[in-house]
Amino acid sequence: MDGNDLVENKCPVMHGGITVAGHSNTAWWPETLNLEILHQHDTKVSPLGKDFNYRDAVKSLDFEALKKDMHDLMTNSQDWWPADYGHYGGLMIRLAWHSAGSYRLADGRGGGNTGNIRFAPLNSWPDNGNLDKARRLLWPIKKKYGNKISWADLILLSGTIAYESMGLKTYGFSFGREDIWAPEKDVYWGAEKEWLAPSDERYTDVDKPETMENPLAAVQMGLIYVNPEGVNGKSDPLKSAAQVRETFARMAMNDEETAALTCGGHTVGKAHGNGDAGKLSPPPEGNDLETQGFGWMNPNMDGKATNAVTSGIEGAWTTHPTKWDMGYFHLLFGYEWELTKSPAGASQWRPINIKEEDMPVDPTDPTKRVMPMMTDADMAMKMDPAYNAICQKFMADQAYFSDTFARAWFKLTHRDLGPRVRYIGPDAPQEDLIWQDPVPAGSKSYDVAAVKAKIADSGLSLSEMVSTAWDSARTFRGSDLRGGANGARIRLAPQKDWAGNEPARLQKVLSVLEPIASATGASVADVIVLAGNVGVEQAAKAAGFDISVPFSPGRGDATAEMTDADSFESLEPYADGFRNWQKEDYVVKPEELLLDRAQLLGLTGPEMTVLLGGMRVMGTNHGGTKHGVFTDKVGALTNDFFVNLTDMANKWVPRGKNAYDITDRKSGAVKFTATRADLVFGSNSILRAYAEIYAQDDAKEKFVKDFVAAWSKVMDADRFDLA
């Protein structure tokens, strides 16, 4: 029998269940904990293999040759997607902007650090219309330079080169972003089921922008920031100003940076709405096979940039859309504007009685002048008093505007690349910027053994040492590479006052550790971590194992002047399942909050499991509570948490919200108490499988070794200087 013998239309694959998405476990059981977020981006997904190191590969790139090729690309118009005014700069800026602009400060997720705009949902967001064309224009360059340049780097570089090619002196650029190879599973983009659903669905009160659901930073599903036509598509520049301010603040931009990015972003390029958006094909992810990843196909394009339809808004913002100049301010403030409609029916603003010489030329016919436009967000720059004042300052000093924009653009495109020690390439700026969370280099030459001896003799308890080290390190976020133990910012505002850090206990511990650091030449950051290591070693010894926790000296101590306190507020833990604590009751379940923290820390499922079990038996719960401390040998690094969790002689009885008793199944006597963050390791089938491994009789030593490895991973998560 061969394939020709198959009956037509009868599938040779049973049910298609392997290759076509069926009903997933989370669809059958929506309350199931989604542990997949801990195992995304596995090396098995990457075509480059587990031994490939992009950050090493990019260092061998011919940077100048690449930049020349990208400059040439800007004016090499292609028939299949003609360049506006013969220049792709505006398109490439939008690609870079929308790649980086999905970043949000609240959890550090989104952003351009992974090349995620290549995949769903971002590749098919309404606001990202026709950016598939921009990526295809970059393909010949990516093909030429291969694995020496990632898509993530190339996409963001394209915007910077575009600005350079149009006359802006940029602030710099760093390489070093590694591509992912599948869509992210950990990013919450919103609960809406429809693209561009009304803003009301993510606000408690849409008239109060600060009531937008956290961690979101865009006003509607499928937008990067705000609706350019106005709040819910209804023009009101002052309401738009309020939404612009909130959305940009949620990605760590102040008013001046926001105004600079808005005005500078619209100094070049144009919007596209010269046609019927209803005739466009589906976006890339939902389009036909033969379109080969292209979406928003326009049957009326006919090789003419003039007929393109993207946002539905039509026109350029300035007289010279391929030139970095002050034309945006000249038109916005030099004319009165009135509300009108684009050919696609979108709301936009047009100037009243504009002079012909101030009108931009047609994108494909330089002999023809056409009307410029402004969006509601642009009118907000004029009508909002604070933004207006900033614009007046820019208008009075072009050099100041250009420098402010260049720095804001650099921040936008590098916000999630991490500290300056990670920067790569000849154009990486050497200046320390406060939003990079700078940390001075620490000493590596002190006597580590002597420091550990002083800590051991200090009188601090095991719990105090381990808890303080954990609290210092747990702020790390793999999403934007912020936080962590390096810098010892736990001793500075705002961290020293966070409820999750137990300020009274923290100050007691610091009052002991800081003199040790001063006396030995070690940094406070190193001493805090060493204290945690001493505690872990003591706990292991109490369990019968002599181990040495790995340690690399060299952490530095940041100062208050190096710390943007407001920006660090977003790193405050409102829950920490590893220390069995929540600041208050939340709609989100404790186990989901635990999972989120584990993902941000870069932990796998087994690492999360072994860390929590070890933290429990060492008695490190917030406030000294006994929930989840399933042992009578507190302070010994035993596998008792898992042994008792999986012991069928025990019964689990709910005693109120997020409170459980562990009772003897026969007598009913209460043996332990627990929270959901404890019992999920026996309830969830995957976590129970991990727990059973660590509960086995032969797992005592493995448990200790695995705990130490996971502990060290967290302590060193921000040691980019060791890479």
Swiss-Prot record:
Active-site residues (renumbered): 98 (proton acceptor)
User: A GO BP term, please?
Assistant: hydrogen peroxide catabolic process
Gene3D superfamilies xrefs? 1.10.520.10, Peroxidase, domain 2 (1.10.420.10)
Task: Kindly report, in one word, the top-level EC class recorded for this enzyme.
Answer: oxidoreductase
What residues does heme b bind to? 266
Record site: Transition state stabilizer: 94
Q: Which InterPro entries does the record associate with it?
A: Catalase_peroxidase, Haem_peroxidase, Haem_peroxidase_sf, Peroxidases_AS
Q: Which domain of life is it from?
A: Bacteria
Q: Which cofactors go with this protein?
A: heme b
Q: Spell out the HAMAP family in the cross-references.
A: Catal_peroxid
This chain's protein is named: Catalase-peroxidase
Its gene name is: katG
